[in-house]
Structure formats: structure tokens, C-alpha cells
A protein has these predicted regions:
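Extended alpha-helical targeting/anchoring segments
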Residues: 1-234
Length: 234
């Protein structure tokens, strides 16, 4: 597992425990505490991810049954070794990579438009005030996950990113926002909302000016901040 932060890259390896989350064990996993050790090491932690389905089950939210793809609903690893890596991560792949530029999407434009218009009516009726329509893209290519992660880290300037390389799958993610940060008794969040296409003639000051004057972008950002504030209060 490689984790990228503003301070560089952390490589976690030699895992003593691997927990595949299910409906039956997630509560016990979240309540697990190490009360014996007074001084915790930097490897006294779990690294992994939660799937939306398993979190929805945890809080009693019902969602339509999803197609099974045999991918874990959530998985966490406990490392025994931490290696600090250089900020300029370099890697040369030994594999012959085969890239396919064609992507398949699970819904077409007509179906997406129908879903969008339906949700638009629900928002106008006051049933909800935010809906995120998700689509799934598939691509059949032969890539090296670490090589892909290194390339992504150079082109995407997100402050945080990570890569999990397991035996049968790899997960790569990067995000400009941090949902939950907990340090001691302090909990904070760093939400981001708004979209502006990158152009050579747009610098940071011009981008800020655009977001401050744009009504749609300002309202979207305020809505996200309000939602995060509500979540933290719970």
C-alpha cells in the first residue's frame, strides 16, 4: 500500500492482518480498540476502504440490490512495516503494457437524461436537495498498477492519493478533498465543490474570482459545507 500526502509517500507492507468486511463483522471491526498499548507505533493502524453498500447497511439505509462482481464491500489491512519514500516517486515497469482507449459505460445518454429529469422533479418538490448520479466505466487493458499510480501522481496534483495492490485486484484513488480528519479530540473536514475547466490563461487568482462571482458554484460549495457541518454535528 502506498499513501501520498503533502509530506511525501508512505509505503506500508508486511501485513499481519487482512479484514474483509461483511454485514456481520463490520460493527465489531469499528468498535475494535487497542487498550493495552500506551504508546502507539506508526504502524498501529488499519488501512483500507469502505464500499457505499456496507456503510448504507450500517446506518439502515436501503439501496437497490447491486449486480455482484465479487469485489469486496470493504477491506482493511494492518501493516507491520512503514517505509518513507522520496517525494519524487519513480518506477520503471517490467511488464509489456497493453492500453485500450475504448471505454464502455453502463448507461447511455438517453437513459442518463431520463434519470436526470426524474431527479430534477424530486428536487423541485423538496424531497431532497442533492442527488449524485453515478456512472460506471469499463476498460480492458493490461497495466502495471504502480506505474499507473506514479504517472497519476505526477499529472494529478491532488494533495492525497493511495494505491492498494492485492493479489487479485488493485485500487488507485486520488482526491482534492478530505472527508474526515481526526487528530486527538479534534475532528475536521475539507470539502470541495465547484468545477472550472483548466486553461493555460487561467491562474489561481482568476479561478477564485470566477468562483466568487458564479452563483451556481457558490451555492454548490455552500451546500457541501453545510452538509459536512451537519455530519460532524452527529
Amino acid at each position: 500500500i502506498i499513501y501520498k500526502s503533502q509530506k511525501g509517500f508512505n509505503l506500508y507492507t508486511n501485513f499481519s492482518e487482512k479484514v474483509i468486511l461483511t454485514k456481520k463483522n463490520i460493527v465489531n471491526f469499528l468498535n475494535k480498540r487497542n487498550l493495552k498499548k500506551k504508546k502507539l507505533k506508526k504502524t498501529d493502524l488499519y488501512i483500507g476502504f469502505f464500499g457505499y453498500e456496507i456503510l448504507n447497511n450500517l446506518i439502515g439505509v436501503k439501496v437497490p440490490k447491486q449486480k455482484s462482481n465479487n469485489f469486496p464491500k470493504g477491506i482493511f489491512y494492518k501493516p507491520d512495516t512503514l517505509i518513507k519514500l522520496s517525494e519524487n516517486l519513480k518506477y520503471r515497469s517490467e511488464y509489456q503494457l497493453k492500453k485500450n482507449k475504448k471505454f464502455d459505460i453502463n448507461i447511455n445518454k438517453a437513459t442518463y437524461t431520463k434519470i436526470f429529469n426524474n431527479f430534477k422533479k424530486k428536487i423541485k418538490k423538496g424531497e431532497t436537495y442533492q442527488i449524485k448520479i453515478c456512472t460506471k466505466y469499463k476498460n480492458q487493458s493490461k497495466i502495471d498498477p504502480l506505474d499507473y499510480f506514479c504517472r497519476l501522481s505526477k499529472t494529478n496534483l491532488a494533495p492525497e492519493a493511495f494505491m492498494i495492490k492485492d493479489k487479485n485486484f488493485s485500487v488507485i484513488s486520488c482526491s482534492p478533498e478530505n472527508l474526515i480528519i481526526k487528530k486527538g479530540s479534534s475532528i475536521s473536514t475539507k470539502p470541495i465543490a465547484g468545477t472550472l475547466r483548466k486553461k493555460k490563461n487561467i491562474d489561481k487568482s482568476k479561478a477564485l474570482k470566477f468562483f466568487r462571482k458564479n452563483v451556481k458554484e457558490t451555492k454548490e460549495h455552500n451546500m457541501i459545507v453545510d452538509m459536512e457541518r451537519s455530519d460532524l454535528s452527529k
